[in-house]
Amino acid sequence: MQVSVETTQGLGRRVTITIAADSIETAVKSELVNVAKKVRIDGFRKGKVPMNIVAQRYGASVRQDVLGDLMSRNFVDAIIKEKINPAGAPNYVPGEYKVGEDFTYSVEFEVYPEVELTGLESIEVEKPVVEVTDADVDVMLDTLRKQQATWKEKDGAADAEDRVTLDFTGTVDGEEFEGGKATDFVLAMGQGRMIPGFEDGVKGHKVGEEFTIDVTFPEEYHAENLKGKAAKFAINLKKVEERELPELTEEFIKRFGVEDGSVAGLRAEVRKNMERELKGAVRNRVKSQAIEGLVKANDIDVPSALIDSEIDVLRRQAAQRFGGNEKQALELPRELFEEQAKRRVVVGLLLGEVIRTNELKADEVRVKGLIEEMASAYEDPKEVIEFYSKNKELMDNMRNVALEEQAIEAVLAKAKVSEKATSFNELMNQQA
């Protein structure tokens, strides 16, 4: 076998291989012997068919199969010998084949980039230092009460957190526009559902009032014909309701799994959940900064085959989220996912090099801790832990999470890490 390797462009490679004619003939004869042992031909017992008849009937197809097998096996041998690491599926380009002559073919593919990590010492990471305070717990309790609130009609003017029912008609330059008209529209104020200025224009008005408000659509508004346009909305306010928050009764508290129904028990449970969320948020904030610094410090080429593969993964995930099927997933424009796919491939290659150079392996103690932490959010943590322990795929996924954490820690060990006092609310809003 003769082998030559050339660089086509960037990460592209072409391996040209020549297989000696005698190697091909030896393999063909060997395979014909195997075929002769199995075939049945009228007039001959199984395994007793003369080789010339076997060759006459099956020679062409056997030769084709043998060539395909030799091409594949010789390519694998060649890349092992040349220490080449292909990325993605190779493209075989067969040359002209004549019986009794050497056979030359080429294989085109991309290789993984040679990554040499640099600039780790210049990465800057700001670690949030956060404590869950009693005031934070109070805010969360109010949020829980608001989620369980009922609505009661009121006579006064609409306030920032009221719920209103209204009719409205929007116009731009005196003309109505699509989506700008509604009847008996229910709007919970203070959630930012409407364009800026709309809710402010409703506040202070009472039931039965008809009025007009002036607003301007944001420049980044989704409808092209409305971006940055001034608009008027004629409004008829038909109902104003205010929240009635439930009291922290024993019955209310037990809804959240606090068996003794006490306020102290609820506060303790809420604090525990907040601290678990906080731990994850701090971890994610530090991780995102470390990865961003790693990517900026290391500009690497990326095999297009890996990007294509990642795009397919993202397409399928998007289709699943919206109830689509495989066919619909593949029809989604690749442009929607290309940037994210490339980013994920780059991050994967860089973290892979961190893992390789630091000879990291998943710490089973960490894996166990991650599973226990995740399971603590469920009603029966022991059941969740047992379910994970019996599922190889889930365990492998968690080992990958642990290994990624260890890689991030290896980056942080060389990076410039500082601390910054932050409130719980500020950090969680950054995560949103």
UniProtKB/Swiss-Prot annotation:
Transmembrane segments: none annotated. It holds the Pfam family Trigger_N. InterPro entries: PPIase_dom_sf (IPR046357), PPIase_FKBP_dom (IPR001179), Trig_fac (IPR005215), Trigger_fac_C (IPR008880), Trigger_fac_C_sf (IPR037041), Trigger_fac_ribosome-bd_bac (IPR008881), Trigger_fac_ribosome-bd_sf (IPR036611), Trigger_fact/SurA_dom_sf (IPR027304). GO terms for cellular component: cytoplasm. It is found in: Cytoplasm. Residues 161-246 form the PPIase FKBP-type domain. One of its GO terms (molecular function) is protein folding chaperone. Its EC number is 5.2.1.8. GO terms for biological process: 'de novo' cotranslational protein folding; cell division; chaperone-mediated protein folding; protein transport; protein unfolding. Keywords: Cell cycle, Cell division, Chaperone, Cytoplasm, Isomerase, Rotamase. It catalyses: [protein]-peptidylproline (omega=180) = [protein]-peptidylproline (omega=0). Belongs to the FKBP-type PPIase family. Tig subfamily. Consists of 3 domains; the N-terminus binds the ribosome, the middle domain has PPIase activity, while the C-terminus has intrinsic chaperone activity on its own. Involved in protein export. Acts as a chaperone by maintaining the newly synthesized protein in an open conformation. Functions as a peptidyl-prolyl cis-trans isomerase. NCBIfam families: tig. This is Trigger factor. It comes from Salmonella arizonae (strain ATCC BAA-731 / CDC346-86 / RSK2980). The gene is tig.
